[in-house]
């Protein structure tokens, strides 16, 4: 009889813990029906199949056709990068945060519930930052001198413990976006007012890929670089790393607009997402053969 009672108590305790865990998860993410403004990064973070948008007021998530927002850590996220375990970010603390301003480089491996300082907390807000999806190597543009770095381009291959200055020779124009290959950190791409650039030596030198077009977005998967540019209209191109072939891809109808963020679902390589200058977001489930709009002028659908 005693043994049976102990089993019942154990089962009830287990159900209570599971219930608390489920409740905590639901409390952290709630349904969202508003506007997604001031987006400074987008991607599929960790093993979560949700598409994360880093905004002025925390994280907004599109998952299984539903929009969600987080209820804590409502920070002004900048330089957001999704990785295989979660995300890395920079920016400024929200009203509910006790983080110093700016927040330096932070990372989260639990969907944004908690943040861990990587480097430069209270010193620098990094807008131009790329993090390898698998390697977690960091490539960034430091906007001004801090306690360790001068102004310029740097990379870290040990999670921010040490930094190496890189030359970025040939890279011209005002920087809009950076991307680093998921696992091969010799490959770095940049989008600037002068075009889209590719480096094959870890950022020491860059070569121009575009002709008379402004670069707007860059994104790597293992095999390819996807980049967006704008001349008389928007363009989305797949650049195959192995042979340098370039393929023009289908974009939705965009009037005086173009992609500023590109993402691919690592759990479903047919699924891509883009976010545009005017606050439109589109999802493709067939490798960019067609697009479904999920944000209209920043308003969720």
Summary of predicted features, one role per range:
Residues 39-43, 75-84, 123-131, 173-180, ...:
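Repeated scaffold domains used in trafficking and secretory/extracellular systems
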Residues 31-60, 72-79:
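Beta-strand-rich domains and repeat architectures in extracellular enzymes and scaffolds
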Residues 51, 87, 138, 187-188, ...:
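Hydrophobic beta-strand positions that form the internal "hydrophobic ladder"
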Residues 56, 92-94, 141-145, 193, ...:
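Short loop/turn segments immediately following the C-termini of beta-strands
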Residues 96-102, 144-151, 191, 230-235:
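Short, solvent-exposed loop/turn segments at conserved positions within beta-propeller repeat blades
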Residues 57-70, 74, 102-119, 152-167, ...:
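Asp-box/BNR beta-propeller loop motif
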Residues 21-23:
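Bacterial signal peptide processing site
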Residues 16-19:
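C-terminal motif of bacterial Sec signal peptides marking the signal peptidase cleavage site
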